[in-house]
């Protein structure tokens, strides 16, 4: 974040915390989501904080704050390697620690935000109380592997990268992002395919299962690791994004997935659940809350997890 937007964002976070405390004083707060350390949300590929009044984490921050959580929303490069995004996130975490007065934070990362928060937890575990991934491709994505079949250096790759980088630039502009990192679609692709994920895991193995579909270490270097994900690409027929995720799900050749991430690839640390009736966007309550009528509300899942962190002393 640049200095001006950083100061504004963090001051707003502090103000919202004060507002939540005022709300609690007048109307009462259960304290259900009141974690010891701030909750810091990290978006995925092509993510943002808010665009044209629509939040990436739709309805989630307000629901967490309502019962006591201090919540900060970060924004990093829409398209880049896990390491580059991690460095951007680390700088913001350091600012949040400074302004909140708390020595650590609870990181929650969706999609590519999962490897991003893992990088921060690995290089600066002293700043991190917990790292939670939601629908994150820790062992790569079959969709990324499918796209990677486009020959490197080919005209097709150049065209595809140009289109995706353009989309990333547009999202960066519309969200008012302070990230000045260039859009790097090919870097993101290399981080999210199976081979790139394996290289990343070799450098940063914390919380990653050593078996094909097991659990990882629950705690490493004082950082607690958690994860959850969905396995239903199509969940609501009136949500237009379900059509896209239903199509991308075909790249998994029958493996359970959320449309972009396989069930086993999503597992890290303590697995809360890996088969919610949710697709990749449902996991952040998108599109606009159009999720399955036959599954727990995604917002409730985040509230339950905040309570879990609270009960774990985090």
Q: In which residue ranges do the predicted regions lie?
A:
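C-terminal catalytic-base region of ester-bond hydrolases, centering on the histidine
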Residues: 210-314
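Serine-hydrolase catalytic core
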Residues: 178-234
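N-terminal signal peptide c-region/cleavage motif recognized by signal peptidases
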Residues: 19-21
């Amino acid at each position: 974040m640049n200095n001006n937007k950083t100061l504004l964002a963090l001051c707003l976070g502090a103000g919202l915390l004060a507002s939540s405390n005022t709300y609690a004083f007048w109307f009462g707060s259960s304290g259900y989501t009141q974690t010891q350390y701030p909750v810091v949300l990290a978006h995925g590929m092509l993510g943002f904080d808010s665009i044209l009044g629509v939040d990436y984490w739709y309805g989630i921050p307000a629901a967490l704050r309502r019962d006591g959580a201090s919540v900060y929303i970060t924004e990093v490069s829409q398209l880049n390697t896990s390491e580059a995004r991690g460095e951007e996130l680390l700088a913001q975490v350091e600012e949040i620690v400074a302004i909140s007065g708390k020595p650590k934070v609870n990181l929650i990362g969706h999609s590519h935000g999962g490897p991003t928060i893992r990088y921060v937890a690995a290089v600066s575990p002293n700043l991190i109380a917990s790292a939670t991934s939601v629908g994150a491709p820790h062992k790569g994505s079959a969709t990324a592997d499918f796209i990677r079949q486009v020959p490197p250096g080919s005209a097709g790759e150049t065209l595809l990268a140009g289109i995706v980088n353009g989309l990333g630039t547009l999202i960066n502009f519309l969200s008012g992002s302070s990230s000045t990192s260039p859009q790097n679609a090919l870097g993101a692709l290399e981080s999210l395919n199976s081979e790139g994920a394996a290289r990343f895991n070799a450098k940063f193995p914390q919380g990653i299962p050593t078996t094909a579909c097991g659990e990882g270490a629950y705690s490493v270097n004082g950082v607690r690791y958690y994860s959850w994900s969905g396995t239903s690409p199509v969940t609501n027929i009136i949500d237009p994004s379900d059509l896209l995720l239903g199509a991308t799900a075909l790249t998994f050749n029958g493996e359970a997935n959320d449309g972009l991430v396989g069930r086993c690839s999503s597992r890290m640390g303590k697995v809360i659940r890996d088969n919610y009736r949710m697709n990749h966007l449902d996991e952040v309550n998108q599109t606009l809350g159009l999720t399955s009528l036959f599954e727990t509300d995604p917002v409730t899942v985040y509230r339950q997890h905040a309570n879990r962190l609270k009960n774990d002393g985090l």
